[in-house]
UniProtKB/Swiss-Prot annotation:
The gene is dapA. Gene3D superfamilies: Aldolase class I. GO terms for biological process: diaminopimelate biosynthetic process; lysine biosynthetic process via diaminopimelate. Homotetramer; dimer of dimers. This is 4-hydroxy-tetrahydrodipicolinate synthase. It is found in: Cytoplasm. It comes from Lactobacillus helveticus (strain DPC 4571).
Amino acid sequence: MATLIDADLLTAIVTPFDENKKIDFDSLKKLTNYLIDQGCNGFVIGGTTGETPTLTHDEKIELYKQFGQIVNGRAVVIAGTGSNNTAETIKFTNEVAEIDGIDYALVVVPPYNKPNQRSMVAHFTAVNDNVKMPFLIYNIPGRTGVRMEKETVVQLSQLDNIKGIKQCASLEEMEYIIDHKAAGFQVFTGEDTQALTARLLGANGVVSVASHIYTKEMRRMYDALYEGKYPEAAKIQRWLTLRMQALFMYPSPSPVKAVLNAQGFETGDCRLPLVALNDEEKVTLAQHLGLEDNALLQKLPLDLGKDLEND
């Protein structure tokens, strides 16, 4: 079993679809192998970027089975199992616990119901007490409509099956969690633009969307940090920041899929209610990524960091 302590650069991987909007496992295998070769050492499968709300129960189970086989222990694998139904979250997490190659579950703060902090504690305590696998909390208030407060995270970090958090919030909140969490509780930022700063503050790393496109650059940034080359690491983060932001200028994961499709990974379009970028949007995205205007309308090279190399 791969563990969180070994991972710093995790990709929240897209779910590729074919022209009939069925999961394309060949494309998933091609993309996964490429990301591992480039320096990714962990994955979230079936998360926000994986369009999990549009996947059926059976599709998720098959996706997780196939993905566990594809990765085959080469990186840590975290599978999304959370929902706004506590009983269903427990049931589904225990199904996923039986799948080879899935190391952890990811349980989101319940969306739509808008639980308060006491309700969140009750929900996650019930999950903790009734599941057969370790899991991470997913705190993403921009999508769930509610924020798990830092004190609540620290309280829940004491529970046996809760091994970490994907935290999409301020750096100040992350600092508090890192300072007060239980030993062995791993903290990951879910904000690409915080990748370097979060690591400096003591987080384990980042769960990233941009790493689909900039794995090599992000790995180089972390390596520079570990080698004490702080100006180089900072330069890479500055280069990445605007590009990371650009990948969210339209509803995600449509932008990252547009880039991957141009690079030949055949991830397909998003399922409704999201739509693919049109040509005008692709031109605008390309401009914000520092590419030629028509770059996403034709074949795109895999290495998009050459101007960083020449900087």
